[in-house]
Amino acid sequence: MSRGSSAGFDRHITIFSPEGRVYQVEYAFKAINSTNLTAVAVKGADAAVIAVQKRVPDSLIVADTVTSVYQISQSVGCCAIGMIPDAKFQIKRAQGEAASWKYKNGYDMPCELLAKKMADLNQYYTQNAEMRSLGCALLFISYDDEKGPEVYRVDPAGYYRGMKGVSVGVKQLPATSFLEKKIKKKSELTSTEAIELAIEALQTSLGIDVRSKDLEVVVVTKDNSKFTKLTSDQVEHHLNQIANRD
């Protein structure tokens, strides 16, 4: 067996290869793309936004039951991209952590602490032989009275970080490149600008004109810190604004 081969080192999650890699964790990152979806999150001056593809894989499925966005608490929302059972498990765990915190402390769990907690759990899954890494990535958004809008990404390796703009999923690279160019030009975005930047980044990365029924857009703002999902008509309005601007 050559030292550059993964054979023998990708069978156990707790074993490093000679190159210092943990292959099972790398495979978990690849599993994020298994649903062929992409999500984009943007932090503005007074709002945080997530825009994510919505794909109904079967004509017999009720479209309203298909979603990638979830309410964790009144003020914290989350988008989970990757293997659906793993994503559902992560969401339930996050909701449980947030509910437990509020029961003990009397107020909603801060978004950063929740992201850190979920990252710690993910990291724990990378070093136990009887477990496997979870094949999904999480995007959290919230509006904090002191910190303002917040966006956090949590990955299968157990790493989390606050972001100005971020994308996860199969078209992550082109979406991230688009965000970097736009945010470099203007970093202080209004809530409307943040929403339209997230939608435009998603649309550009996909290379197609998306319809309102193909998108889910959720937002928290200074004026309304509750996690809110935009209606189809509201999404259509923003799509028209983007089209007219172009």
From Swiss-Prot:
- InterPro entries xrefs: Ntn_hydrolases_N, Proteasome_alpha, Proteasome_alpha-type, Proteasome_asu_N, Proteasome_sua/b, Proteasome_subunit_alpha6
Q: Is Cell inner membrane set as a keyword in this record?
A: no
Tell me which GO cellular component terms the UniProt record holds. Answer: cytoplasm; nucleus; proteasome core complex, alpha-subunit complex
Its predominant location is cytoplasm
Where found in the cell? Cytoplasm; Nucleus
Q: Which residues form a coiled coil?
A: none
The answer to keyword Disulfide bond applying to this record is no
Picking any one GO biological process from the record gives: proteasome-mediated ubiquitin-dependent protein catabolic process
> Which Gene3D superfamilies does this entry report, sorted A to Z?
Glutamine Phosphoribosylpyrophosphate, subunit 1, domain 1 (3.60.20.10)
State its role.
The proteasome is a multicatalytic proteinase complex which is characterized by its ability to cleave peptides with Arg, Phe, Tyr, Leu, and Glu adjacent to the leaving group at neutral or slightly basic pH. The proteasome has an ATP-dependent proteolytic activity.
- Give the family per the record: Belongs to the peptidase T1A family.
Q: What is this protein called in UniProt?
A: Proteasome subunit alpha type-6
Its lineage opens with: Eukaryota, Metazoa, Ecdysozoa, Nematoda, Chromadorea
